Every structure is written in C-alpha cells, then in structure tokens.
C-alpha cells in the first residue's frame, strides 16, 4: 500500500510532450471577482468568481453553452426568447446548467460563488436588456471596494496524460484535469469525500468498494457530477480526450489501489 501526499507549494512541473491542449490564456475580473480563461484545441472553459449579491450574465448566445456551479449558492434565471417561458431557481453547488441557443440567462450570487462556462464556438453575445438591467442595478447597490479575490491558481503540472491546474477558492481545492485518449488517472482512494465533475469528452469511470470488493463502472459522455465517497477506489480512463474537475477540502492524500494503479502506470509507459 502506497500513500501519496501532494504539496501544492512544492509541486514540480514536468513537461514531456508539446502537444498538450489546455492552456490558461489570460485572467481578468472586476469588483465582482476574478475570471480565468482557459482554452483547448476546441473548447473554451472560463471560471468566474461571483461575490455575494452581485450578478453576471444578462445576455444570450447563438450557440449552446454549459454552466457548472462549482462552489456556493446562486439564483439562476433563464428566459426563452421565443416564448413567455421563464425559469427562476435557486441552486447549490455542485450543479450543471445547460443553456440552449438564443436563451438568455442571469446568475445572481446568494453566497460567494464560483462557476464556469464552457462552449465550442467563437465567443459572441447579445444583450437581453431586462436581465442586463438587473446586473447594472446590482452594481449600483454596492460600494465598489478595491479589487480582491478568493480565487487563485496555486500551481500546474503536466505529464503524458495531460495538464492539471490546481485552483483554490475560499479555502477549497479545485483541480482542472486534462485526460488524453487511452490514458488513465486515479488508481487510488482517499480518506475524504471528493467531487468529480466530468466536463467534456468520453470517460469510462471505475469504482471499487474496498469493504465489499465490488466494482462498478460506467461510460460518461456528457457533463456529470460524481460524488466519490471515502475509501472508494476510483479510476478514470479516457475513451476520448477529456476534461474533468476534482474538488476536496484539506490536504491531498491518496492511497494506491494496486489493481487500478497498474493500469494507470501501464498506459503511461506505452
């Protein structure tokens, strides 16, 4: 049995291949919070910090877009432009929101929150003024203090399987993980509960309950949330180039599960 402890402050960056596809291309933000812009060969993934009682959105796109609420609590409003239909709901993390083309949405933070948007298109938007006016009014209601942020990129790591970006928000760890086709990640278990959110691609996900030695597996082709319980061995196998998020509280510690870890290492050695 091997225990791995990962210190984000001292993590060494390794670069074995030059064909990695996910990059942090820029960062920005305002008094509402920080924005991180990531780009792969086909996908844009943008992280938005949204401080309590502020709003983002108020526009629509001519392409589908997916939002993932990673941390916090929001009110989410959706307005279908071809009808009178409007949906208003409160959501707590983790949650996945799929927005169809020409559908306006508005996100109002109930607590300090972190969400991402992802899409496969050149960015373009048009204002939906009823929602956009709410964004403007929320800005007017609060005194704009000096920019500060709870969202940070702590480190990054790269090997033949792809890149990992280590983020931290409000004391919780969020890792954006790339998984190349025919490679595997994981092969271990934790003493803590973790969340894995598959964003894009196609992944075969394996779990083994160590108490009963029973295995389950499934193929994931759409965004999906996986709650991984303590002492459940798990592994991700890339059927296509894929991306997912891992989140957890506290110090990272993993204990290898040999049956899965052998697969991870064999795929890396090929």
How would you label these PLM feature ranges?
Residues 46-61, 175-190:
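Conserved short histidine dyad/triad with adjacent acidic residue
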Residues 81-101, 210-230:
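Short acidic-glycine-tyrosine-enriched beta hairpin
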Residues 63-77, 192-208:
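Glycine- and acidic-residue-biased ligand/ion/polar-headgroup-sensing regions
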Residues 23-25, 83-84, 108-152, 213-214, ...:
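Double-stranded beta-helix
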Residues 56-58, 76-77, 99, 104-110, ...:
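Short beta-strand His + acidic residue motifs that chelate non-heme Fe in jelly-roll/DSBH
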Residues 62-63, 95, 103, 111, ...:
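A generic "binding-loop/recognition-motif" signal
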Residues 5-44, 132-173:
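A short, N-terminal "cap"/entry segment at the start of jelly-roll beta-barrel domains
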């Amino acid at each position: 049995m091997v225990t791995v402890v990962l210190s984000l402050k001292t993590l060494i960056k390794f670069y074995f291949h030059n064909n990695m596809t996910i990059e942090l291309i820029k960062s920005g933000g305002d008094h509402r919070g920080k924005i991180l812009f990531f780009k792969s060969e086909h996908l844009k993934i943008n992280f938005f910090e949204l401080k309590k009682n502020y709003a983002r959105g108020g526009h629509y796109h001519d392409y589908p877009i997916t939002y993932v609420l990673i941390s916090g609590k929001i009110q989410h409003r959706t307005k279908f432009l071809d009808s009178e239909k409007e949906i208003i709901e409160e959501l707590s993390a983790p949650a996945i929101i799929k927005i169809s083309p020409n559908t306006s949405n508005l996100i109002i933070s109930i607590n300090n929150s972190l969400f991402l948007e992802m899409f496969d298109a050149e960015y373009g938007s048009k204002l939906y003024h009823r929602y956009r006016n709410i964004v403007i009014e929320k800005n007017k209601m609060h005194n704009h203090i000096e920019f500060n942020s709870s969202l940070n990129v702590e480190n990054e790591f790269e090997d033949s399987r792809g890149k990992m970006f280590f983020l931290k928000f409000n004391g919780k760890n969020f890792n954006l993980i790339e998984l190349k086709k025919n490679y595997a990640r994981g092969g271990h278990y934790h003493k803590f509960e973790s969340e894995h959110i598959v964003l894009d691609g196609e992944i075969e996900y394996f779990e083994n309950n160590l108490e009963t030695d029973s295995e389950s597996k499934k193929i994931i082709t759409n965004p999906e949330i996986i709650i991984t319980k303590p002492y459940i061995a798990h592994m991700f196998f890339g059927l296509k180039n894929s991306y997912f998020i891992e989140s957890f509280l506290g110090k990272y510690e993993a204990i290898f599960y040999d049956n899965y870890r052998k697969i991870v290492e064999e795929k890396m050695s090929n």
